[in-house]
Structure formats: C-alpha cells, structure tokens
C-alpha cells in the first residue's frame, strides 16, 4: 500500500485521523521496509504489532511470520484491517494496549513446539508511547522491540550516562534492556504530518530481567533526578536521613559531588537497595 493509495482510501472513506489517539499514518514504502528488515523476522517468530493503524507495516509483517498479533484501539481501523488483511496467520484484538495483559495474549498464540522469539514491531502512538514502552519492558516473554517513537523520546531512551538527555526514564528502561537508536524518520513521511521528527529504536535482550518493584524504583529515580543540577546527595537527603546517605557514599566510595546524570543504571539499583534495606532494619 503506497502513499497515494493510503491518502485516497482515507479520502474515500472520509476517515479523519484522531488527534486524541495520536494517529499519524506512515506513508513511505522505504521506511516501512526498513523497519521490517531491521527486525530480522523469521517465520517462527511471534510478532506483536501495537497500533497497526491503516496496515502499512502490517501487510509486510504478515508475509514474514507465521504468527502476527495486532492490537488496535480504533474500531474503524479494526474493522478495516479485518477486511484488508485476510490471512490465517493474522490475529487482531480491538482493545487499548494499556489494558491488555501482554503476556497472557502472547501465550494464547505461542507455539510451544517452535523455538519462538517474541518481538514487538510497531509505530507507537506518540501520546502514550512512554506508557507503552514501560508495559513492553515489564513483559516476561518479549525478547526484542523495534518501535518508532518521537525522536526526543528515542533520544531519552537511548541516552548515555553524562549526557543531557540521560534521566530517570532512561535509567528505568536501561535496567531492563539494551537500547539502540537505529535510524531517524522525517515528519514528511506521515499523514497527517506531525510537528516532530521520529526515530526507530531497538529494545534488545528484554529477557535480561532485574527483580525489583518497578513503582518503588521509579519513584526513587524521580527523586534522584528531581533537580539534575543539584548533587545527588542533596536530592536523596530530602527523603532519606542525611547520615544514612553519607554512609552510603562512603561505603560505595562515591564522590560527594556526584550528580544523578553521572551514575550508571545498575548503580542506581544498588543505591536503592542500600537505602531501603537500611530504612527497614
């Protein structure tokens, strides 16, 4: 389905993209193929597509895998895809992805006889992309995700320590997986054209799970990055006893002038465990 066909279909069916749902349809055949190719899909892989929209990427994915599961909230697009993609390996759910138990859904379509990898390939709705990313990384079954998000979001997810974009969300995501920005996508490749640029990012090795309470760690990270220009010690002393914070810095041989942006993701988890274990004793 090329850009002319998509635009004509939208016009013929008087389809008005929903701003509330963050609908921007990818038009470029080159970008669609590029996304599918970087995902390195085999027939045995189970592919989960979140927000398939008009089916631009869907029609390529369905040719690559024996099992494609899509989640679409918009009833209009759900009805369109049920008619447009008529393949036995295509399964579509009409629901809000934030309300779906992803692992339960995946298990419904998993073939235990195959050495299946579970991959997410999707152009995410930008309005809720951070919430979807958090849902993906918490899955116990998803191996990899190749997702298109707002460029600024991709840069946050993929930021390195000691860089400006490195923040609490960066650390939380990188505690679950490796991240890599694959390529950027110009706004002109979409209809309607968004006001921001986009990028495709790879969330890799999602089975490398860390056992912690994500809500508690997320709250801790927000405290650490509350004021990025303040010393980490000062941010933490707003919540924890200053004596305990100083003892931790000494025990870990940390510079008292460190800021949150200077610390690697895994170290934050150690600091969290230290402070909360001591608090509970």
From Swiss-Prot:
Transmembrane segments: none annotated. Keywords: Cytoplasm, Methyltransferase, RNA-binding, rRNA processing, S-adenosyl-L-methionine, Transferase. The keyword S-adenosyl-L-methionine applies. It comes from the Bacteria. Its EC number is 2.1.1.182. Pfam families: RrnaAD. S-adenosyl-L-methionine binds at residues 24, 26, 51, 72, 96, 123. It is found in: Cytoplasm. PROSITE patterns: RRNA_A_DIMETH, SAM_RNA_A_N6_MT. One of its GO terms (cellular component) is cytosol. It catalyses: adenosine(1518)/adenosine(1519) in 16S rRNA + 4 S-adenosyl-L-methionine = N(6)-dimethyladenosine(1518)/N(6)-dimethyladenosine(1519) in 16S rRNA + 4 S-adenosyl-L-homocysteine + 4 H(+). InterPro entries: KsgA/Erm (IPR001737), rRNA_Ade_diMease-like_C (IPR023165), rRNA_Ade_Mease_Trfase_CS (IPR020596), rRNA_Ade_methylase_Trfase_N (IPR020598), rRNA_adenine_dimethylase (IPR011530), SAM-dependent_MTases_sf (IPR029063). GO terms for molecular function: 16S rRNA (adenine(1518)-N(6)/adenine(1519)-N(6))-dimethyltransferase activity; RNA binding. Belongs to the class I-like SAM-binding methyltransferase superfamily. rRNA adenine N(6)-methyltransferase family. RsmA subfamily. Specifically dimethylates two adjacent adenosines (A1518 and A1519) in the loop of a conserved hairpin near the 3'-end of 16S rRNA in the 30S particle. May play a critical role in biogenesis of 30S subunits. This is Ribosomal RNA small subunit methyltransferase A.
């Amino acid at each position: 389905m090329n850009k002319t066909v998509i635009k004509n279909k939208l016009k013929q069916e008087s389809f008005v993209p929903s701003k509330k749902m963050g609908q921007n349809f990818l038009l470029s055949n080159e970008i669609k193929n590029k996304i599918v190719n970087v995902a390195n899909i085999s027939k045995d892989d189970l592919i989960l597509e979140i927000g398939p929209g008009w089916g631009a990427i869907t029609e390529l994915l369905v040719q690559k895998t024996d099992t494609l599961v899509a989640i679409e909230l918009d009833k209009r697009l759900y009805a369109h895809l049920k008619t447009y993609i008529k393949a036995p390996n295509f399964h579509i759910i009409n629901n809000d992805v934030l309300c779906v138990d992803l692992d339960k859904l995946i298990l419904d379509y998993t073939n235990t006889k195959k050495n299946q990898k579970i991959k997410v390939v999707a152009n995410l709705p930008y309005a809720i992309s951070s919430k979807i990313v958090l849902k993906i990384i918490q899955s116990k079954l998803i191996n990899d995700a190749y997702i298109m998000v707002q460029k600024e979001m991709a840069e946050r997810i993929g930021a390195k320590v000691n860089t400006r974009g490195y923040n609490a969300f960066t650390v939380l995501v990188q505690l679950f997986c490796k991240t890599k920005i694959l390529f950027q996508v110009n706004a002109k490749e979409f209809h309607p054209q968004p006001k921001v640029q986009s990028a495709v990012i790879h969330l890799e090795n999602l089975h490398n799970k860390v056992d912690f309470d994500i809500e508690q760690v997320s709250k801790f990270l927000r405290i650490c990055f509350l004021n990025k220009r303040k010393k980490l010690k000062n941010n933490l002393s707003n919540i924890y006893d200053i004596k305990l914070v100083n003892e931790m810095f000494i025990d870990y041989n940390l510079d008292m002038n460190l800021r949150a942006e200077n610390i690697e993701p895994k170290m934050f988890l150690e600091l969290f465990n230290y402070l909360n274990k001591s608090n509970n004793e």
